[in-house]
Amino acid sequence: DRDRLLIAMMAETGLRLGEILGIHYTEDIDFERRTVRVRYRESNTNLARAKNAEYRIALLSNTTFEFLVKYISDNRKSLMNSEYLFTKLTGKNKGEPLDADSVYSMLKRLSKKTDINSHPHQLRHYFAEERRKEGWDLNDIRFALGHKKVETTIKYLGENNERLIEATDQYYS
């Protein structure tokens, strides 16, 4: 459940791996608004960081939010010993904050099972592409991804997309 939630949240919010791993479930989740806050913290013991010392908010769908609430409820005992949403659930390091290496290992195992090569950053690209299909403005996608420049966002959406070229022209006109 933890891994599915992590993947769902990354695909749905466009958050970077470090941003997801840095979520403190007691401070960063607004249960009334179904949002997750991204905060830059130097103190994260798993070295997870929000890039560019930024702060922003990501909205979760009803489905993912319900999954999140169930995950917290099902894992309350192990989460009580940690402020992090995502922790190691087994082994000698049980209860410690999940780190990037663990996520890469999990995705590698998933890739072997499914024959689909996956990487955390691909989920950010997926987020950007899906939001574009939904008609999001280029600047809104840029903001959601935490990009400073719209040119970076454009790279996430592919270079030969005519709709993207039109959107870029509109953005700069």
Please provide the spans of the model-predicted regions:
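Conserved catalytic core of the tyrosine transesterase superfamily
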Residues: D1-S173
